[in-house]
Amino acid sequence: MATKQKIRIRLKAFDYKLIDQSAAEIVDTAKRTGAIVKGPVPLPTRFKRFDILRSPHVNKTSRDQFEIRTHQRLMDIVDPTDKTVDALMKLDLPAGVDVEIKLQ
């Protein structure tokens, strides 16, 4: 029984517009080369919150609150061809998007 090869791509970014644009570009490239794409699946957004004192000396009750949201998407490319791998390697994505690629 032959096992099908699968490429799992995980995208992370602080801006959801950039990540959606990158995901659409990856899906379009993979479909153009004849691969089957599952996704993009939106994963839960991670929130990091920081509380910082406004005053350097007194007024502990006065604080600023900041947060960083990390958006994530997951895609699987099932049974990729050599053309698919070459096209994905040549793909130019925005600088704000972190890409993790696993071959399974």
Curated annotation (Swiss-Prot):
Which InterPro entries does the record match to this protein?
Ribosomal_uS10, Ribosomal_uS10_CS, Ribosomal_uS10_dom, Ribosomal_uS10_dom_sf
Q: Give the top-rank taxon of the lineage listed in the UniProt record for this protein.
A: Bacteria
Q: What keywords are assigned to this protein?
A: Ribonucleoprotein, Ribosomal protein
The chain's coiled-coil residues are none
Looking up Pfam families in the UniProt record yields: Ribosomal_S10
Q: Does the keyword Phosphoprotein apply?
A: no
In the record, biological process GO terms are:
translation
Molecular function terms from GO: structural constituent of ribosome; tRNA binding
Q: Which GO terms describe its cellular component?
A: ribonucleoprotein complex; ribosome
Q: Does the keyword ATP-binding apply?
A: no
Matching entries from SMART domains are given as: Ribosomal_S10
- What family is reported? Belongs to the universal ribosomal protein uS10 family.
Q: What's this chain's function?
A: Involved in the binding of tRNA to the ribosomes.
- Outline the subunit composition: Part of the 30S ribosomal subunit.
Query: Protein name, please?
Result: Small ribosomal subunit protein uS10
Q: Which gene encodes it?
A: rpsJ
